[in-house]
Amino acid sequence: MISTFILVIAAVVSIFISRVIPQISVNYLSLLVGMVLFCVPILGNHIEKFNSEIFIGLIVAPLLFFEGQATRLNVVGQEFKHIIQTTVVLVILAMIVAGFSLAALGVVSLPLAFILAAISTPTDATAMESVTNGLEMPTTEGTFLKMESLFNDASGIILLNMAVLWYANGYINYGQTMMDFMISAGGGVLFGFVSAWILVLSRQVWLRSSYNALNASLLIYIITPFILYYAAEALHVSGIIAVVVAGLVHNAEAQRSRLLNSQQVHFAFDLVSMITEIFNSMVFVVLGFMFIQILVNDHFGHGSLNFLMIGVVLYVSTVLVRY
């Protein structure tokens, strides 16, 4: 709880600084605040050890849900072919090229090379906004990247889990791997779509009744991505895909609800905007904190050159596959 409070305050501070210095992206400022946070013992010592499962469930899942809600469902339908190409074909191809390229260096084993490749292949909407801040992005390319960033986190996580199993077991079952991929991705889509529509229909009935309470309705809406993510993971389907699809369905509801209760929808959008901004900032605060933590703990020793080579190969391989 103390860790969360400190990270939220750090995120708010970085957002405030970005208002004072608008020329610098808030994400870069959040990185810097995270680095400073580690250097202040009275604060840094209260930050708990990083837990990837908690981070994905409590930060990444709601972020993707709200990003999905900002995207029209019909746009996804129009760009479905490109989404499949970028989130499945491109991600798998990039992972294969990067994985074999890393293994060719002789620094890491083939399974470990594929683990690193799976981590590096997905794009990130937040990082893209930071890099393109102040620049003009072509509309078509911007749309493709936005659509890709909604779904390829799920592809990357699924492929990462498969690479980890390969590393742990010492072999890979291609048929079972493809089947698991289809079940996880397809199950996530189905679960997210059905669950979201049940929630949407229930909320619409509630809105039309005399029992409608703004605070209760907003609370249910805010906790929706957390519930859907952990429920999907409990069913062994992709929780990330489930929350993205649920967000898209909620966008369709929001368009319809504006005619019924515009005040409530406007308030919900403002609340979501605030939460998204804080969560995005928290991601980079954590990244900055961990970066300094790794340096201080001397995780970069005599093998630093190997790490640098791995990073360069991953970057070059991904760029070559994409362009």
Q: Where does each model-flagged region fall?
A:
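Transmembrane helical cores of multi-pass secondary ion antiporters/exchangers
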Residues: M1-Y323
